[in-house]
């Protein structure tokens, strides 16, 4: 994964739903919790003091249980929802300062959204659906169709250009939605529970296809899910929300190895750590394996390393991304990492 500078910066974003959100937010800052706020004022705390950075070229997953605020947060990134307080910077510009015309251009050209329920136009063909945003933006019809055809092929639907949504499976419909988002050539894709409505096998195929597309295109993707396995599979970085607050943000390996609190620890307790944790995080810098010891990349999972140790190797050397040896790893160190609560 090659990531660039900060693409989206969220600074102290809070959102309160109700008639007097500013006054309600002041009560929260004074110590009132979410339940008290609802009971005493009728206001709903959606988000509270969220700060995070999303870098260019990464898949950033925002996850949590129903009602945690994840869908509310992602809708701030294209201003479908306005914050009660805070700033949202896109390439260093505060999008909250945009007037109507600039916001419209931003939504058409800089961000694209993929929804859980596909949101396809049933009376239009696949290619018409994919080209729809381009034609709204004034792209000439023939050019729009040519760009749409390229994206349809990219998501594996070549040959279905003239089909209607009702003639497609759920997974195929979601591919159309993804192609429509890609056709705009937006810098950022916002995907709100995009695969949640799909059957498990189709869902896994879509997850793998998304990782492949992101690797080839280098898009910045913000992905919402309630599924921890999906978050760990897709996310270069993961943010975990609870009751509108950010509990932890980091790589999947970081969160598994060092949960920030008991809530996060419970969330990740049943995960197969060996398939997620990477050897580089547990290499011992002072350990120098024998000259003939196996050399493995830092991105090797602990599960894969354990299989190497099963062959009799007493230690392995860990190679960083720059090709240098960063340390060594022993079977005991792997066992300690896998057993850690």
Identify the meaning behind each predicted range:
Residues 124-131:
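Short coil-to-helix segment of the ABC ATPase nucleotide-binding domain corresponding to the Q-loop/switch region
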Residues 183-187:
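A short, proline-enriched helix->beta-strand linker immediately N-terminal to the Walker B motif
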Residues 249-250, 258, 328:
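ABC ATPase "signature
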Residues 243-244:
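Conserved ABC ATPase "signature" C-loop
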Residues 291-314, 318-322, 329-341:
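The conserved cystathionine-beta-synthase
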Residues 164-168, 172:
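Conserved ABC ATPase signature
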Residues 13, 27-36, 91-94, 135, ...:
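Conserved ABC ATPase "signature" region
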């Amino acid at each position: 994964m090659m990531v660039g500078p900060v693409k989206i910066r969220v600074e102290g974003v809070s959102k309160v739903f109700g008639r007097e959100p500013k006054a309600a937010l002041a009560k929260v800052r004074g110590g009132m919790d979410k339940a008290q706020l609802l009971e005493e004022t009728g206001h709903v705390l959606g988000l509270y003091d969220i700060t995070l950075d999303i870098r260019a070229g990464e898949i950033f997953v925002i996850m949590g249980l129903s009602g945690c605020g994840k869908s509310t947060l992602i809708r701030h990134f294209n201003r479908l929802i306005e914050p009660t307080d805070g700033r949202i910077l896109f390439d260093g510009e505060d999008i909250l300062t945009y007037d109507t015309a600039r916001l419209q251009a931003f939504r058409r050209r800089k961000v694209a959204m993929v929804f859980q329920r596909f949101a396809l136009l049933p009376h239009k063909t696949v290619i018409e659906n994919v080209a729809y945003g381009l034609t709204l933006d004034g792209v000439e019809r023939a050019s729009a169709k040519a760009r749409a055809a390229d994206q349809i092929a990219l998501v594996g639907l070549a040959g279905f250009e003239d089909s209607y949504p009702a003639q497609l499976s759920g997974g195929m419909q979601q591919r159309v939605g993804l192609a429509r988002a890609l056709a705009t050539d937006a810098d950022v894709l916002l995907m709100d529970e995009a695969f949640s409505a799909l059957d498990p096998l189709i869902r896994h195929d879509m997850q793998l296809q998304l990782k492949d597309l992101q690797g080839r295109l280098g898009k910045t993707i913000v992905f919402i899910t309630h599924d921890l396995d999906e978050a760990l599979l897709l996310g270069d970085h993961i943010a975990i929300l609870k009751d509108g607050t950010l509990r932890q943000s980091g790589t999947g390996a970081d969160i598994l190895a060092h949960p920030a609190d008991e809530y996060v620890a419970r969330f990740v307790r049943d995960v197969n750590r060996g398939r997620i944790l990477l050897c580089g995080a547990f290499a011992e810098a002072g350990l120098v394996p024998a000259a003939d010891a196996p050399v493995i990349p830092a991105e090797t999972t602990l599960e894969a390393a354990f299989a190497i140790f099963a062959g009799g190797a007493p230690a392995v050397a860990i190679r960083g991304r720059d090709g240098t040896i960063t340390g060594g790893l022993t079977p005991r160190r792997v066992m300690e990492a896998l057993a850690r609560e």
